[in-house]
């Protein structure tokens, strides 16, 4: 199954992130807050090349379905140019704003210096991260999901080993975690580039400066709505985290660790989303409506089933997960409560992300943007702001707003699926 290697890759990746977070968490709440200050900004940064990865994946999958070999090569070349260009621009911006990020995110005076240094160092390899994200998406579109899995797992193992060396052996603390992230990102980007250039489907015969205008235009048309979705979503996460960070170090640490702990439990949904994007794109390229319908039905059923199981497991192991990341009893207690709450949201979140994958595979990216923007900013952010500033709402209330956002988006994206592509 196309989804399984992607799911395994993400599971192992999150497990490595768990170890990473636990290593920093053992340094204390201030160290956790310093790293967490950059977390949502990092999501925003990563979401930009992800959008162009969707454009690459959709076009390559549809070209494979229609049997257009030359077009596959042309899309691959455009994808490489976009990956480098986007990475260079983002890296330049991040390096310029690095001194101000901690202040924007409301970090305390004790946390701000370490948070600033951490953000600077994880910004250094952004062009390599962009290469890894966009080119891995292109490779997955060929149904080769194993190679990106091996690269991703290797990079995360390297990151954990370097974390241990820099944090504990060299005693570099938060700075050591940043150095480890930087080095592993450079290595994974270079390896992905090497695999991409040697891939049998991507024969880059002409100069990278000779690009097919139609493919470039379609890359923009597909990627721009996804980019707006990701920016609306992740910038919303930044504002959301900023609102929580002003509630105190303990609350922010509990929130950040709980958000990270939950990642493992929605991996199944993201694995099927990536597979649905590829398989729906190929079905559309073949103009095979029956195959498309079968992919949609099986993807939705499998995603909801696996996310329901994930929700049950999250509820059962919530306290153990929080205890793995931190020794602080207040952080553990608060984080356990919100994780048990969000466990009931997992099936709805699964519906939301698998529906997005189906929309992307068909090249229909505008409607998901409208839904994402409305849900994030009108439901989650506005209600959280009002709740905190006018009703003294705590972290539990904040997470209720987040759950409401996910449920509404799931319903609004799932209902139109039957009419997306008619015979």
Predicted features along the sequence, with ranges:
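Short alpha-helical transmembrane segments in multi-pass integral membrane proteins
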Residues: 1-6, 60-127, 171-224, 280-345, ...
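Transmembrane alpha-helix boundary and packing residues in multipass membrane permease domains
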Residues: 6, 10, 22, 39, ...
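Helix-terminus/linker motif at the lipid-water interface of multi-pass membrane proteins
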Residues: 11, 15-33, 102-109, 165-172, ...
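Short runs within selected transmembrane alpha-helices of multi-pass transporters and secretion channels
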Residues: 53, 122-140, 148-156, 177-192, ...
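N-terminal transmembrane alpha-helices
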Residues: 2-22, 26-27, 40-55, 59, ...
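Small-residue hotspots at the loop-to-helix junctions and early N-terminal turns
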Residues: 29-40, 115-119, 178, 249-264, ...
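Small-residue-rich hydrophobic transmembrane alpha-helices
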Residues: 32-92, 129-148, 254-312, 316-318, ...
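Transmembrane helical elements of multi-pass membrane transporters/channels
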Residues: 1-20, 121, 132, 155, ...
């Amino acid at each position: 199954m196309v989804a399984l290697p992607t799911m395994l890759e993400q599971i192992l990746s999150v497990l490595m992130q768990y170890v990473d977070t636990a290593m920093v968490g053992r340094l204390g709440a201030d160290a956790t807050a310093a790293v967490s200050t950059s977390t949502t900004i990092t999501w925003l940064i990563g979401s930009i090349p992800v959008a162009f990865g969707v454009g690459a994946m959709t076009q390559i999958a549809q070209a494979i379905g229609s049997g257009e070999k030359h077009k596959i090569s042309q899309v691959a070349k455009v994808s490489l140019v976009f990956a480098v260009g986007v990475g260079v621009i983002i890296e330049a911006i991040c390096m310029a704003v690095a001194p101000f990020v901690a202040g924007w995110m409301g970090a305390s005076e004790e946390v701000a210096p370490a948070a600033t240094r951490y953000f600077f160092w994880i910004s250094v390899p952004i062009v390599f991260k962009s290469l890894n994200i966009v080119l891995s998406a292109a490779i997955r579109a060929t149904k080769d999901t194993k190679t990106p899995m091996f690269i991703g797992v290797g990079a995360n193992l390297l990151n954990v080993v370097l974390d241990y060396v820099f944090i504990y052996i060299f005693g570099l603390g938060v700075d050591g975690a940043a150095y480890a992230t930087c080095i592993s990102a450079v290595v994974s980007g270079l390896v992905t580039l090497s695999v991409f250039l040697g891939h049998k489907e991507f024969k880059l015969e002409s100069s990278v400066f000779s690009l097919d205008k139609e493919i470039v235009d379609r890359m923009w048309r597909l990627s721009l709505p996804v980019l707006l979705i990701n920016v609306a979503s992740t910038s919303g996460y930044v504002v959301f985290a900023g609102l929580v960070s002003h509630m105190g170090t303990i609350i922010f640490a509990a929130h950040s660790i709980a958000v990270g702990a939950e990642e493992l439990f929605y991996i199944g949904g993201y694995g099927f989303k990536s597979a649905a994007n590829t398989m729906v794109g190929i079905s559309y390229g073949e103009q095979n409506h029956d195959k498309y319908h079968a992919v949609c039905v099986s993807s939705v059923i499998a995603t909801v089933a696996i996310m329901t199981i994930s929700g049950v497991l999250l509820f059962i192991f919530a306290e153990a997960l929080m205890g793995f990341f931190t020794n602080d009893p207040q952080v553990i207690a608060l984080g356990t409560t919100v994780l048990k709450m969000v466990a009931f949201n997992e099936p709805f979140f699964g519906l939301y992300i698998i529906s997005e994958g189906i929309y992307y595979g068909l090249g229909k990216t505008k409607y998901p943007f409208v839904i994402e923007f409305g849900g994030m900013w009108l439901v989650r952010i506005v209600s959280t702001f009002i709740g905190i500033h006018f009703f003294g709402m705590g972290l539990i209330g904040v997470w209720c707003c987040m759950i409401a956002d996910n449920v509404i988006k799931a319903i609004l994206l799932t209902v139109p699926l039957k009419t997306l592509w008619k015979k």
